[in-house]
Each structure stands twice: as C-alpha cells, then as structure tokens.
Amino acid sequence: MIYECEVTDIAPLRMPKVYRVKTVCGDKELELELHEEIVEAPKIGTKIAVTITNNKEECLNNYFCAHGYVVSNTQIGDIYRVVISLHGFLVVIKSKVPLEHKELEHFYIGVTYT
C-alpha cells in the first residue's frame, strides 16, 4: 500500500538527532520517527510517499527503506491505530476505519519525498 501524504508537523524527540514527522494522507494520518543522520528532515508542506509492503525489492526503490513488525493494533475512541516498530523507531497509522494489519506482521516501510 502506498500512502500519498503531506507533512504537517516535525518535532524533535528526546533522543538526540531523532525527529517525528506528522503527515496527513487522505483520510489517514501517519507519524514516522526518523534519525536525521539517515533521513534528512523534510519541510512542512513537503509531499511524501510512504510505502508499506511485504516486498523488500519494492521497498528498496524508495529513498529510505526499513523493515519492522506491527507491535500494536488498537482502537482509542473512534480512531483505529496501528503501530509498526522499525527496531525502535515507530510508524503510527491512524484511521477512522479498522486497519487490517495484525500484531507481529512483518512489513517493509519505504519513504520517498515527492
């Protein structure tokens, strides 16, 4: 699945050189935690494509590619939330409709600035 997103906020985290990118992707919101020495922080308003796939080769076509596992699939109020851990860096998908990702499911996450 490819999410076409727009960056709405960038916030530094307590861990040095790590930042959180908040995006809006149509009817979903994505938050990504990234390290500035690996992925340069985008600017607010930047368009990015986030690919979530089971295919490593598809992921490798992106500017950034990592793999990880779904660690949480919950509903908080009327928002469904899936958390994918990229070995400690988190990707959070928020939606008003249930998401079909299962806990411990393996994914590759690709990010490209468009």
Feature map (PLM): residue ranges:
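Mixed-charge, low-complexity intrinsically disordered regions
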Residues: 1-80, 85-114
